[in-house]
UniProtKB/Swiss-Prot annotation:
It comes from Trichormus variabilis (strain ATCC 29413 / PCC 7937) (Anabaena variabilis). InterPro entries: PSI_PsaA/B, PSI_PsaA/B_CS, PSI_PsaA/B_sf, PSI_PsaB. Chlorophyll a B1 binds at residue 661. Phylloquinone binds at residue 678. This is Photosystem I P700 chlorophyll a apoprotein A2 1. It holds the Pfam family PsaA_PsaB.
Length: 741
């Protein structure tokens, strides 16, 4: 007899109901719970999946290069990047009639195509790509790389090539390898590519596989490097009149510290970027030699964590906080590690979103407004999922892996002991932010509706304006630090009366970029609305994690695992309080918050791009302004994507907008009606099926049963999330592309 799905759990495989399928899907990635799983096998499986993950990433990148080279217009786009729309790929659809074919034949193509809003054209152009042949070459190289990684994944599952558990637990070796090998050497390699290929190409000098070994990136060669005269590499930078990809106005410098933007491309100077990556490489290669491995030299992380002295002075531990036992706790819990990694990656992803538009590093991307909007929104959405995931795995760690004995008296136990104070402070700040921010918005709404807008309560963000002024923004007249030519920040060593980054002050005071945008009362209000969302999301997640092991209401909570619906009907108050429930609830708040973040960013930028900042400034101070002048006004083109007169090139976004709403609304069916309703419905359908001629010839092996409450919630949450993302993505791209192409 064939073994039934799932193979990883005999208990589930023998379940006579449809639970077998749903629980198997839920537990598929929970390797720890699989039959016969050992700790060593767990690490080996996860290690092998990393290779598969990398293979998928390389395959994806390869497919982008391949489709653009095959069906795109890269070579045409290069000639006029400000006006030619980049093509992602062709579309073939048997449903297209003549009007649709005409609508989607755009950007100089011969047939229907999709426009690229990912920024890959700008990226490839900046790093030195110039021809379709180069794109094809890159595509084939990445395809081979992906194959290599797939093979490596398979190889590391073979008995002879499976690393031992001790190898996985060697934290210092892994840290050295990741710091020096991955971060350090890859940054050095990237600096090398920029210096040897990208910078010469930006100056009109071709560097390819045919001549890269014979073309020196700097006229002085390596002599300044070996003689310690490194300043030579910064002399003679590109001039303000440099035309990108030509020799006109170009210099010879390869490592500079100019600051600001290239006047024509409005992106960071390539020579500054190369300098940055070289510095990162040096730092990380040094950092990758700091930890003690086989040679008995360097730091032992365990000793540092357990230390009670700091340069001879007695302390509680690192940062004068007791970290005893943390090393083993961290090193023996994959969930603890994953929680940290997701938290760090989440912060970095949000940080990337903020920097991609304010300090654009790719040529001309600052003027591709739809791409800017898409990239910002994409990275902020990714960030919230990573952050919520961090708390989820932190809670799983506390339920499954936390050992109270091992962590006696250290910072982990200290946080758990102070959980009431932490949770109540988060609650207080959420209530304060919520009532005050909503109160201000509603007050302003009412007075505007009554025809007395001058009675609005408008608060200038003076502290934020002060910070901007300190960085050199002179508009506010606050005369402090870099905005005051007589201050020590302005006149400081090494170059008196000449700011360290000559291009910085020009950039921060230019009205045409997104660096340190001018802010006022509308920004003050939406900032606090976003702060409310962030603090409430954090409250739900922190409470869920800190109460995951037990609460006053349910002291034995940890015995029920990470996700459970209730402890039976006889124990009141135990429903909806598992750590999983806090993850589930927090995601609604996280989505809510990222909505406000992206609404704010998009509306503010639409005004800047259209040269009409007054609309945001005047109408963002009351709720109706947001509803009417941002959401309603910008959905007009979207709703008109197709109408009785035919279709236009926004119609695909109009359909996606509708479809997104449909998916989103479907979520509520699972979120509002729970198990009893569905069980009755299923029983009725089964009864009808069994009594219907012909239909009753078909039977099923599994008895149909309704989803559990937790499963229904996850299905509802998935629909809510996917619908939310699709709806806003369509709105964002159509409303921006409809205005700017």
């Amino acid at each position: 007899m064939a073994t039934k799905f799932p193979k990883f759990s005999q208990d589930l495989a023998q379940d006579p109901t449809t639970r077998r399928i749903w629980y198997a899907m839920a537990m598929g990635n929970d390797f720890e719970s699989h039959d016969g799983m050992t700790e060593e096998n767990l690490y080996q499986k996860i290690f092998a999946t990393h290779f598969g993950h990398l293979a998928i990433i390389f395959l994806w990148a390869s497919s982008l290069l391949f489709h653009v080279a095959w069906q795109g217009n890269f070579e045409q786009w290069i000639k006029d990047p400000l006006h030619v729309r980049p093509i992602a790929h062709a579309i073939w659809d048997p449903h297209f009639g003549k009007p649709a074919i005409e609508a989607f034949t755009q950007a100089g193509a011969n047939g229907p195509v999709n426009i690229a809003y990912s920024g890959v054209y700008h990226w490839w152009y900046t790093i030195g790509m110039r021809t379709n042949t180069e794109l094809y070459t890159g595509s084939v190289f990445l395809l081979l790389f992906a194959s290599l990684f797939l093979f490596a994944g398979w190889l590391h599952l073979q008995p002879k090539f499976r690393p031992s558990l001790a190898w996985f637990k060697s934290a210092e070796s892994r840290l050295n390898h990741h710091l020096a090998g991955l971060f350090g050497v890859s940054s050095l390699a990237w600096a090398g590519h920029l210096i040897h290929v990208a910078i010469p190409e930006s100056r009109g000098q071709h560097v390819g596989w045919d001549n890269f070994l014979t073309t020196a990136p700097h006229p002085a060669g390596l002599q300044p490097f070996f003689t310690g005269n490194w300043g030579v590499y910064a002399q003679n930078p590109d001039t303000a009149g440099h035309i990108f990809s030509t020799s006109q106005g170009s210099g010879t410098a390869i490592l500079t510290f100019l600051g600001g933007f290239h006047p024509q491309t409005e992106s960071l100077w390539l020579t500054d970027i190369a300098h940055h990556h070289l510095a990162i490489a040096v730092l990380f290669i040094v950092a990758g030699h700091m930890y003690r491995t086989n040679f008995g030299i360097g730091h032992s992380i365990k000793e540092m964590m357990n230390a009670k002295t700091f340069f001879g002075k007695p302390v509680e531990g690192p940062f004068n906080m007791p970290h005893q036992g943390i090393y083993d706790t961290y090193n023996n819990s994959l969930h603890f590690q994953l929680g940290w990694h997701l938290a760090c990656l989440g912060v970095v992803t949000s940080w990337v979103a903020q920097h991609m538009y304010s300090l654009p590093s790719y040529a001309f991307i600052a003027k591709d407004y739809t791409t800017q909007a898409a990239l910002y929104t994409h990275h902020q959405y990714i960030a919230i999922f990573l952050m919520v995931g961090a708390f989820a795995h932190g809670a799983i760690f506390l339920v499954r892996d936390y050992d109270p004995e091992q962590n006696k008296g250290n910072v982990l136990e200290r946080v758990l002991q102070h959980k009431e104070a932490i949770i109540s402070h988060l609650s207080w700040v959420s209530l304060f932010l919520g009532f005050h921010t909503l109160g201000l918005y509603v007050h302003n709404d009412v007075v505007v509706a009554f025809g007395t807008p001058e009675k609005q309560i408008l608060i200038e963000p003076v502290f934020a304006q002060f910070i901007q002024a300190a960085h050199g923004k002179v508009l506010y007249g606050l005369d402090t630090l870099l905005s005051n030519p007589d201050s020590v920040a302005y006149t400081a060593y090494p170059n008196y009366a000449n700011v360290w980054l000559p291009g910085w002050l020009d950039a921060i005071n230019s009205g045409t970029n997104s660096l340190f945008l001018t802010i006022g009362p509308g920004d003050f209000l939406v900032h606090h609305a976003i702060a409310l969302g962030l603090h409430t999301t954090t409250l739900i997640l922190v409470k869920g994690a800190l109460d995951a092991r037990g609460s006053k209401l349910m002291p034995d909570k940890k015995d029920f695992g990470y996700a459970f619906p209730c402890d039976g009907p006889g124990r009141g108050g135990t429903c909806d309080i598992s750590a999983w429930d806090s993850f589930y609830l927090s995601l609604f708040w996280a989505l809510n918050t990222v909505g406000w973040v992206t609404f704010y960013w998009h509306w503010k930028h639409l005004g800047i791009w259209q040269g009409n900042v007054a609309q945001f400034n005047e109408n963002s101070t009351y709720l109706m302004g947001w509803f009417r002048d941002y959401l309603w006004a910008n959905s007009a083109q979207l709703i008109n994507g197709y109408n009785p007169y035919g279709v236009n090139n926004l119609s695909v976004w109009a359909w996606m907008f509708l479809f997104g709403h449909l998916v989103w609304a479907t979520g509520f069916m699972f979120l509002i009606s729970w198990r009893g309703y569905w069980q009755e419905l299923i029983e009725t359908l089964v009864w009808a099926h069994e009594r219907t001629p012909i239909a009753n010839l078909i039977r099923w092996k599994d008895k149909p049963v309704a989803l559990s409450i937790v499963q229904a919630r996850v299905v509802g949450l998935a629909h809510f999330t996917v619908g939310y993302v699709l709806t806003y993505a369509a709105f964002l791209i159509a409303s921006t592309a409809g205005k700017f192409g």
